[in-house]
Amino acid sequence: MNIAILSGKGGTGKTTVSTNLSTIIGANYIDCDVEEPNGFIFLNPSQIKREEVKVDYPVVDSSRCTLCGDCAKVCQFNALVRTKKEIILFEKLCHGCSACSIACKHSALTFGKRTIGIVEEGKCGNLICKRGVLNVGEPMAVPVIKKLLKNLPQGTNLIDCAPGTSCNVVNSLQYADGAILVTEPSAFGLHDLKMAVQLVRNFNLPFGVIINKYNAENERIQKYCEQEDINILGIIPYRREAAEVYSLGKMIVKLPEYKEIFEEIAKRLREVFPWN
């Protein structure tokens, strides 16, 4: 069972929910927020194994190249530019699709590999923790995410997605059997929750909502969920003591009130999702 945890916007508490819930239900933790992965701060896994993530990029053989420019014309990402003297490659724009090589009539293109990030795997007690880390300055996270999700552990996996509803999240949802949407009771939270709801509905996934940073003065999220017939899996109150524990890199389920809340969320999960 792979459960994706996502949000329409950043800062709603995806990683808070993912890490604490993984310890309560005994699920493996998979951090797909590869541009800013921070789940390991809280789970602190040991026995870390690392593997580089590499992508293809074209290499021009100047002895064969006639500067016809066919490779540049066919590139949909403008990674290749023909000048009077050479073909210039903007390697960070290249998606490694090989269209340029197919278009070249003179076999002047071969492919090399370059490293764009790493995938790490470790242990937190009996749980397996995995994360992808994109190198600073690299624009494309999807190859790292795909590498990370290629061989998921057996059992239940919580997939901590990137914020938003971009292609990074779409690629993560392709491996999911269900989704948890984490939101906050603000105007921006509701706006972006609606986008996330539309996305998971397009994937036809069972899903529910967790309201984080809750205060009783604002019921906009509950009203929206009622109108849309969306399951509310749990409500996590806004408390100073939780923020203090979190700021120290510790799990909020260490607090009795929050442990009880996450145990109730775990029960609701089993009711909403086709658990096996």
Per-segment meaning from a language model:
Residues 31-33, 131-136, 145-169:
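Switch II (G3) loop of P-loop NTPases
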Residues 168-187, 193:
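Inter-motif core of Ras-like GTPase G domains
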Residues 4, 27, 157, 179-180:
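Short, well-ordered beta-strand core segments
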Residues 1-25:
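Walker A (P-loop) phosphate-binding motif
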Residues 199-276:
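C-terminal lobe/tail of nucleotide-utilizing enzymes
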Residues 70-89, 99-115:
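Iron-sulfur cluster-binding cysteine motifs and their immediate structural context
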Residues 8, 21-25, 44-67, 78-96, ...:
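Ferredoxin-like iron-sulfur electron-transfer modules
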Residues 27-40, 113-118:
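Short beta-strand-centered segment that lines the nucleotide-binding/catalytic pocket of NTP-utilizing
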